[in-house]
């Protein structure tokens, strides 16, 4: 069995360099919620050094709230902003001899695109316009995955090690109780259940079906690195290969 392990990088976390030794894919902030041209260059350089797949992590223009504010922008605006961000990272990667492989939206852009078909379409269209060979990463079973498939993109369905799930397979909003899993044992058990058995227990106790093709590790938690190492070790014990 094979699984991709991804992390969001270039967002000001000191653990970026160490995380790049543990993951197979990096989602690099493109300046709209965090990061800038220099952090993008640095992350690309380290990703290439570690053989990690390079991906763009576009966001709403919302540095003040780290891309976590809901917005209602016209689809053409979202298309242009997404194309702008992924195009910038693609150029930076190319200049360093690397290749951008995937795109994963950030924060509220990701969450809204999981449920709003028009928004999802604008993002998928931007990815396709930049490079039809790019992989589009989105929440398992979401509108974003369906939009990517309509454009003929390769999609990658994502699950989260440390996030609570609702009965419909969507994430518990960060503003609500149960959104974040603080207990390491619980996060490990949830991840294995999703990867090995394709299901996750919701905060209300029901099982939701999920397709796990990539697991997101958040690099901004207090114990992020220790958990990442433990998850890698657990995957190795179970014969699960980590690869993009």
Curated annotation (Swiss-Prot):
Its EC number is 3.5.2.9. Keywords: ATP-binding, Hydrolase, Nucleotide-binding. The keyword DNA-binding does not apply. Gene3D superfamilies: Glycoside hydrolase/deacetylase (3.20.20.370). This is 5-oxoprolinase subunit A. Catalyzes the cleavage of 5-oxoproline to form L-glutamate coupled to the hydrolysis of ATP to ADP and inorganic phosphate. Belongs to the LamB/PxpA family. GO terms for molecular function: 5-oxoprolinase (ATP-hydrolyzing) activity; ATP binding.
